[in-house]
C-alpha cells in the first residue's frame, strides 16, 4: 500500500508544548529531587489507584479532539469507533486491525446482493468508551459478531468480545452478541470467511466462540467458508507467476 507521510512541521502543530513541558517536569532531575520507590503504604494505596480514574476518563475526548485535527490535515475522518456499511444493518461485525479492510470488501459484496450488514472498527481500545461505542451501533442491529485476534484459554471469551458483551447490556433491548477468533499464526481470513460470519449471524442459533480461517476437526468450532465470494472490482487484472527451479548435476 502507498502511504503519504505527514511533514514534521504539520505534526509539530498537533503537539501541546505546554502539556509536554509539564509532563517532562515529572522526570527525575537533580535540580528538583524527589524520592520515588516501588513500595507504597497500604493506608493510601487503594485511594491513589482510584484517583487515576479522571485521567483515563478524559482520554477518549482528547483522542477524538486530535483525530479531528488529523482529519483537517489529511481529509480522512477517524473516531474512537467508526462505522461502515448499511445504515439499517441488522447484523454487524466489531473488530480492530487490518482485518477491517477485508470485512469492508465483503460488506460491499454482500450489500450488492441486498444484505443489510455492517462493521464497527475499533480505533481506541483502551480506555474503552462505552458511550461512543453505543452511539456507533445502528438502532436496527439485532446481532453482533465480535472478532478477536487472540485466544484466552480457560476464559469464557476473548477480551474484545467480553468488553462488547458488557457494553451492549446498557441498551434497553440489547442485540445478541457472539464471539469468534481469527488470524493466529498468520492464518489471515479471506472474504469467504467473513461472509461465513455474516451467514452464521443470520441463523436462528448462531455458533458462539467460533473460528475462521482454519478447519477445526477436533472441537468443530470453525465456520465453513462461503464458496464463490469474489470481491474483485471491475477492470482488475490478476496474474499468477510460477517459478520453477531445477538443479542439474554435472
Language-model features, listed with the residues they occupy:
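Buried hydrophobic positions in well-ordered alpha/beta secondary-structure cores of metabolic enzymes
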Residues: 93, 121, 144, 164, ...
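Redox- and metal-dependent alpha/beta enzyme cores, enriched for Fe-S-associated oxidoreductases
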Residues: 87-115, 128-135
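Conformationally flexible catalytic loops at phosphate/diphosphate-handling active centers
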Residues: 1-82
Amino acid at each position: 500500500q502507498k502511504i503519504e507521510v505527514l511533514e514534521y512541521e504539520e505534526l509539530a502543530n498537533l503537539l501541546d508544548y505546554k502539556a509536554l513541558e509539564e509532563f517532562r517536569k515529572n522526570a527525575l532531575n537533580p535540580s528538583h529531587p524527589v524520592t520515588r520507590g516501588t513500595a507504597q503504604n497500604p493506608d493510601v494505596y487503594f485511594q491513589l489507584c482510584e484517583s487515576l480514574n479522571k485521567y483515563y476518563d478524559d482520554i477518549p475526548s482528547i483522542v477524538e479532539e486530535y483525530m479531528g485535527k488529523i482529519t483537517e490535515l489529511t481529509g480522512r475522518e477517524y473516531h474512537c469507533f467508526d462505522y461502515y456499511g448499511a445504515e439499517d444493518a441488522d447484523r454487524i461485525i466489531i473488530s480492530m486491525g487490518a482485518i477491517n479492510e477485508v470485512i469492508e470488501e465483503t460488506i460491499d459484496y454482500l450489500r450488492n446482493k441486498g444484505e443489510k450488514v455492517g462493521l464497527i472498527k475499533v480505533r481506541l481500545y483502551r480506555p474503552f468508551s462505552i458511550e461512543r461505542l453505543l452511539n456507533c451501533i445502528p438502532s436496527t442491529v439485532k446481532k453482533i459478531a465480535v472478532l478477536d485476534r487472540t485466544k484466552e484459554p480457560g476464559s469464557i471469551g476473548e477480551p474484545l468480545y467480553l468488553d462488547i458483551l458488557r457494553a451492549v447490556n446498557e441498551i434497553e433491548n440489547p442485540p445478541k452478541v457472539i464471539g469468534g477468533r481469527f488470524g493466529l499464526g498468520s492464518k489471515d481470513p479471506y472474504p469467504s470467511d467473513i461472509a461465513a460470519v455474516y451467514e452464521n449471524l443470520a441463523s436462528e442459533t448462531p455458533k458462539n466462540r467460533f473460528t475462521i480461517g482454519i478447519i477445526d476437526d477436533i472441537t468443530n468450532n470453525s465456520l465453513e467458508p462461503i464458496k464463490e465470494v469474489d470481491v474483485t472490482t471491475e477492470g482488475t487484472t490478476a496474474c499468477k507467476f510460477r517459478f520453477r527451479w531445477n538443479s542439474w548435476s554435472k
